Structures are given as C-alpha cells and as structure tokens.
C-alpha cells in the first residue's frame, strides 16, 4: 500500500481534509496530514490567503519540506490548491517520490528550476469552470505537465467550485468527489503493481 503526504488548502486543515484522508486510509494506505498553518483555520479563501501572504509562500513550502524530511522518501505527495505548491515542489525535486496528486491547482514546472521527472506518475484534478483553476493559469500548467510526463493524467469535472472535494464546505460536490476518489484509489493501487 502507498504512503501519502497530503497538504491542505488555504482555509487550513478542515474536517473535510481529514475525511478525505480517511477515505484513502480506508483503501489501506497510510496518510499523513500535517497542519501547515499551525492551528490557524479560516472561513474564506481570501482570509486564508491573507495569512499565507503574511507568513510567505516560501515558509509554507518550507513547513511542508520539514514534514517530508521526517518521512520515508518513497512517498506520494498530494495537495489541495495551496497545498499543491509544497506537494509539487517535493515531488518534482526530491528523489524517490512514488507519485503525485494535485487537487484544484498546478504550477509551471519551471517554478522549481527543473523539469518534471518523466517517469513520475501524477494525477491532476479540477473543475472545468473553476475560476481559480481555469482563469489563473493552473489548467495551462496542468496541460504542460501532462504533455511532458510519461504517466500523467488531467481530470476535469463539470462545475465551478474550487474546493469541491472538501465535505466540510458548501462548495462540496459529492458526485465529483466520488469519481475523484475512485480515480485516486486506482492510481494508488497501481503504484503497488
């Protein structure tokens, strides 16, 4: 079974993130869910991003790297939105990563100074009308990553919600999340083959 390091989004470590992690654990996987906000949580994306700007994006990624340094290198890095920054940087630059899962976000691989490891499997999930994912360049970065990697998939779901797989938020889409979880669990299962 896979070991997963899962980073939360800009609203913090919500109950919905824990629920998602529990779904992966139900598939037999080990899931680590660190709190990169050190106990802070927010009711809006804007408030969460204001906190991130206050402490700095680099600090968020560094907190993720510190957690990763205490875990095995052979791990799947996963992130929701803001958490994709730490997950993508670690997956792209740390040796022996097993895979990557990006939810609602993707950044250009050039941001981390190296190409995506061609044989590192990755899935990217987002809604096809999510203004954050579609209008802020994430979908283009996702298409570029998929084109450059040997084992990469981009899954688009109908809808305009950003945090659609967080069951504790009003943006939750149960149908899209069920399909996302099915795809993620299959991805993790295939890593063991």
Question: What does each model-found stretch correspond to?
Answer:
Residues 71-80:
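Alpha/beta-hydrolase fold nucleophile elbow
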Residues 151-193:
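C-terminal catalytic histidine-bearing segment of alpha/beta-hydrolase fold enzymes
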Residues 2-72, 164-165:
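Serine-hydrolase catalytic machinery in alpha/beta-hydrolase-like enzymes
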Residues 116-122, 149-151:
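Short, proline-enriched alpha-helix->beta-strand connector loops that line the catalytic pocket
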Residues 124-126, 157:
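Short beta-strand/loop motif that positions the catalytic acidic residue
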Residues 131-138:
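Conserved alpha/beta-hydrolase "acid-adjacent" motif
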Residues 79-83, 87:
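Gly/Ala-rich beta-loop-alpha elbow adjacent to hydrolase catalytic centers
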Residues 96-106:
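A conserved short beta-strand
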């Amino acid at each position: 079974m896979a070991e997963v390091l899962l980073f939360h989004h800009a609203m913090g470590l919500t109950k919905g993130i824990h629920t998602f992690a529990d779904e992966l654990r139900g598939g037999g996987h080990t899931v680590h869910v660190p709190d990169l906000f050190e106990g802070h949580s927010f009711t809006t994306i804007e408030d969460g991003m204001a906190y991130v700007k206050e402490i700095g994006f680099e600090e968020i990624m560094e907190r993720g790297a510190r957690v990763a340094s205490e875990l095995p290198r052979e791990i799947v890095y996963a992130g929701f939105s803001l958490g994709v920054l730490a997950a993508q940087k670690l997956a792209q630059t740390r040796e022996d990563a097993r895979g990557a899962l990006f939810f609602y976000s993707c950044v250009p691989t050039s941001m981390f100074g190296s190409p995506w490891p061609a044989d590192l499997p990755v899935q990217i999930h987002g809604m096809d009308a999510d203004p954050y994912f579609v209008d802020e360049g994430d979908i283009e970065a996702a298409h570029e990553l998929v084109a450059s990697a040997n084992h990469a998939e981009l899954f688009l779901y109908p809808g305009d919600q950003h945090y659609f797989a967080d069951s504790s938020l009003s943006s939750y889409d149960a149908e899209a999340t069920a399909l996302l979880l099915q795809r993620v669990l299959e991805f993790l299962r295939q890593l063991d083959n």
